[in-house]
Amino acid sequence: MCFEIEGAEVARRTLERFGMEAGAVDRSAIAIILHMQPGVTLSDGVEAVLLDRGTAIDVRGVDIELVERLRTTVTRTYPRGAFDRHFLRAIAREAAKRSDCQSHSFLHEGDLTGWMARSPWAAEATRT
């Protein structure tokens, strides 16, 4: 099972355990499943758009100017450390097992490693 599906199931169980309303649980699970798919729009739900855009900022540095004034404070409080290395290792493990997962196409057809290396966050990781 692809990690976005696994993550959605873990989130679903956790949110249900905390008593979240069923519709909100479903929207959260769908957002997690869709967050690595290209072309997420408001028709997919506000949660999906926010998670998609947040992931783009966090992993690739897309639209980093939206959080630029907070970046130093955030990385000082929550150092990224070896996040990039660990994240890429996890993606590579999944891609090696499951060529039908989105992680496989990001790693082998996209430029995930390059995106992350060029991200403004990469420079922060070297300072923490």
Model-derived segments and their meaning:
Residues 20, 37-128:
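Divalent metal-dependent phosphate-bond-processing catalytic cores, especially two-metal-ion Mg2+/Mn2+ enzymes
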Residues 2-18:
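An active-site-proximal "capping" alpha-helix that borders the catalytic cofactor pocket
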Residues 5, 9, 27-30, 52:
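A broad detector of short, well-ordered amphipathic alpha-helices
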Residues 1-3, 35-36:
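Histidine-centered active-site/metal-ligand motif
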